[in-house]
Amino acid sequence: VIIIAVLFLTACQLIATASYARSERKHPDLRLSSRNSKLSKRCLGSREQCVRDTSCCSMSCTNNICF
């Protein structure tokens, strides 16, 4: 029974992987736009206005100014 379950799960994983690869080939523009959106995110430099620590390169936002 365990062997059958392992084979079933392996087959499901292979099917999902093949489906994802096929989807990437059909819609390459979506893949590029998601890659570009990741590359375009940047952190705020010193003395720029911020709202939270994670937006600053230094991870320090005090009184809405990056330090």
UniProtKB/Swiss-Prot annotation:
It comes from Conus abbreviatus (Abbreviated cone). It is found in: Secreted. GO terms for cellular component: extracellular region. The presence of a 'disulfide through disulfide knot' structurally defines this protein as a knottin. This is Conotoxin AbVIN. Residues 1-17 form the signal peptide. Keywords: Cleavage on pair of basic residues, Disulfide bond, Knottin, Secreted, Signal, Toxin. Expressed by the venom duct.
